[in-house]
Amino acid sequence: YQGQKCSAASRAYVPKTVWESMGNDLVAEVEKIKMGDASDFSNFMTAVIDGRAFDKIKGYIDRASNNPECKVITGGKCDNESGWFIEPTIILTENPNSETMVEEIFGPILTIYVYEDNAFEDALDLCDKASPYALTGSIFSSNEENIQKAYDKLRFTAGNFYINDKPTGAVVAQQPFGGARASGT
């Protein structure tokens, strides 16, 4: 779905030591994603929906590329010669309020903000206040106390909230759904 799904992950808050241990692996996995014609089933990803979406998503990548607080660490190439292809892109930002952390892109972009390990509760506040939108959200942790803190702080932040599962894991009508904010939840 090329990130064009309401439950696609578009932003992540990652503790520094976790990022140091998995950042390179994440980039390597994203770089393995094969993109091309939808009729070739060996492709995992294809074009975005139309030219308007292409222009909008490309604009986010271009602005991030020119922002000294952001760095495109993989992807970022856009090709509209035969379809509207945008590589899966990861942006690393130093600013938790940068454009791609607070706006809904609806495309193949993940922006990551790395926070100091001792700033978990501050990161939860950032998550809570980042955007008026959020159909889905996830927290990954092996620390039960942090899971509970995240649950308590973020339980009304998204319509679907996952613990140690991807945000696109929903099975319609198989879980409670509701919430607040401007996502139609």
Predicted regions and their residues:
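Conserved C-terminal structural/oligomerization subdomain of aldehyde/semialdehyde dehydrogenase
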Residues: K34, C78, F85-T185
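ALDH superfamily catalytic-core signature
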Residues: Y1-P96, V114-K129, I163
